[in-house]
Every structure is written in structure tokens, then in C-alpha cells.
Amino acid sequence: MIDVKQQINAVRRQVGTRVLEAGEARTVTVSQSYAAPIEDVWDACTNPERIPRWFLPISGDLRVGGRYQLEGNAGGTIERCDPPSGFAATWEFGDQVSWIEVRLTAEPGARTLLALEHIAHVDDEQWAEYGPGAVGIGWDMGLVGLAVHLSSGRTVDQRESATWTASADGREFMSLASDRWYDASVAAGTAPAGARAAADRTTAAYTGTGS
């Protein structure tokens, strides 16, 4: 489906904090440069007919103030839309509410840098247990679909994606991504021993290899 190591190396991962009205929140950010003009990347990320071609089926009213729902996943409210430079929305799953911000930047050579920041209130116990990879690996997987779609123009079949995720390549990808989230966690100030233990638990949860 994709060159595992090439995709792992193509993504930059960052961990941080942000102060919101309700208090301090954790942030995880993934960013990747694509060989596609900004208008094409914007369309891939906002067109309801195109989003399912690389991510998940989506329904709702995709405009500021409108509600969206990803099939079998999160929903939320679109809070800001600045075409083609970015958008922001709530990310609601069950009784948990967090936020996403997507930023697009045109680069030389008709390329585009996409950065996605996920902002969430996470209690210290949960963060210590699984670290940033609990959310970050999921976004890594999403960027795989976008990379395939933008580079080839083809639709990423959901069954093909599920089969790849369960394959040796898919498990290797998640393990390597978890290691990179360990690096990002340590760079953000987490003690290496704690970050390593959290990354190992997250790897086991994603790959089904046990703890």
C-alpha cells in the first residue's frame, strides 16, 4: 500500500501543551509535505465527496457552525474555515470533546505542507499510561491514506486499508510510528523511562501483541 519507512520519515511529530479556558490541554501535531498544490490538498480535506476516498465516509453540513459525522468515528462542529489555508473543528467521540486544527501552507514546486494539531484535555494518569501515541498513531494512519490518494489519485479501499493495517507491514508501521511518538514525547520533556513504557503499551494496544 505504501513504503513504510518512507512514510514514517516523511511525517514530523510534535507534542506540546496549550492553555484553554478550561485549563491546560495536551497537543499532538502531525505534519507532512505533499507533492500537490494547496487547492488540491484543501479539496481532499474538505470535499465531502472526496474525504471518503482516503479517510472515512462523512455526513453533515460542512460549513462554519455545521455538524459533521465520520462513519464509525468522531463527529463535531466546524468552528472555523479559511480556504485554502485551514479549518478548525471540535472532535467529539462518545462523551469526550477535543479539538482539531488543520493548517495548509503552499510550498515551492507546487507542494503543500499540511499540519494537523489535535488538542485535548487528558488527565495525567491516562497520559502517563499511553502517552501521545494513543492519539498520534491514529493520525499517522490517516496521513497514510492521504499520501496514497494525493500521489496516485486513487480511492483507498477501506477493506484494503483494514487488511494492510493487520498485515506485517501495517504492524511495522504502527510500531515505528509509536517509536517516533516516544521521541516526540521525550523532546517535549517526558522522562525517557516513562515515555518508553507508555509507548510500549500503546504499541501493544495498536498491534495486538499484548503488553
Predicted segments — roles?
Residues 1-21, 119-211:
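Terminal "cap-and-tail" regions of soluble proteins that handle hydrophobic small molecules
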Residues 21-23, 29-30, 36, 40, ...:
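Short beta-edge strand/loop motif at the mouth of beta-sheet-based domains
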Residues 32, 76-79, 99-106:
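Hydrophobic/aromatic beta-strand elements that line small-molecule binding cavities or substrate pockets
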Residues 32-34, 69-70, 74-77, 90-93, ...:
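Hydrophobic alpha-helical segments that drive targeting, anchoring, or assembly
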Residues 41-42, 51, 78, 87-89, ...:
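Hydrophobic pocket/interface hotspot
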Residues 59, 86, 92-94, 98, ...:
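Vicinal oxygen chelate
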Residues 83-84, 94-96, 107-111:
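Short strand-connecting beta-turns/loops that link adjacent beta-strands
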Residues 87, 96, 103, 115-117:
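Ligand-binding pocket scaffold of soluble enzyme catalytic domains
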